[in-house]
Amino acid sequence: MDTPDKNARVLYDYRQTINDLLINHYSIRWQHWAAKQGKGIRNQAHGSPANILDLYAVSDVPEIEGRDLVSIKAAPSVAHTEGKKLSSSESATWLDEHFQSNLGDVKKALDLFFLGGVNHIFYHGTCFSPQEAPWPGWLFYAAVHFHPNNPFWEDFKYLNQYVTRVQSFLQDGTPDNDVLLYYNIADVMSEQGNRSLQHFSGLIVICWNLRSEKVR
C-alpha cells in the first residue's frame, strides 16, 4: 500500500545509498589514493547529496566558503570533533565587481572565517597572466584579484602578516565549544519534495531544524 511513511522510507533508502556510494566509493578512495602518494586532500563537501559532515570527516583538511556564519562553521566543526588540525576556506572569491574590493573588504571576509573556526586561509582569485599581457592582465570570474596588477598588491603583505598571526594562534589553540547541535540527516533525507536528491549545506539543515520545531 502506498503510504506517506513507506514513501518516506523508500526515499530515505535511495538517498542513503547515494550517500554511501559518494563516501565509500569516491571520497574515501580518493583520500586513500592521496595518502599513498604522501599527500592529503582538501574538500569542499557542502552542496553534495550526502551527509556533508561525514564527507568533511574523510578530508584531511575540510574546506568551506561563503559569507553565512552558520554554514562556515560546518567544516571547522568537523575538524574539531575529528581532531583535525586544520580547516580551510575558499576566501574572498567575490566581494564586489572587478578591482573594486579593497584590503579592508578582504579582511572583513577573513575575520568572519576566523570567527567560524577556520584556521587555514586560502585566497581565491589568483589567475595566471603572462607578463606581456596588457593591463590588467588575464582575468576570470572571481572579482578580487590577488596578483601584482592589482593596485593593493604592495600592501597585501600587511594583510598577510595579520592572517599569519591570527591563524597561528588558532592552529595552536584548543577549540572550546559550549553547544553541539544534532545534525538530523535522517529526517532531512526522508522529506518528500520535487527533487529525488537533496544537496546539503549547513545552513539548509539548520533552517530545516528551525522549521520542524515550529511545526511541532
Regions found by a protein language model. Give the residues of each.
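Carbohydrate-binding surfaces of carbohydrate-active enzymes
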Residues: 1-216
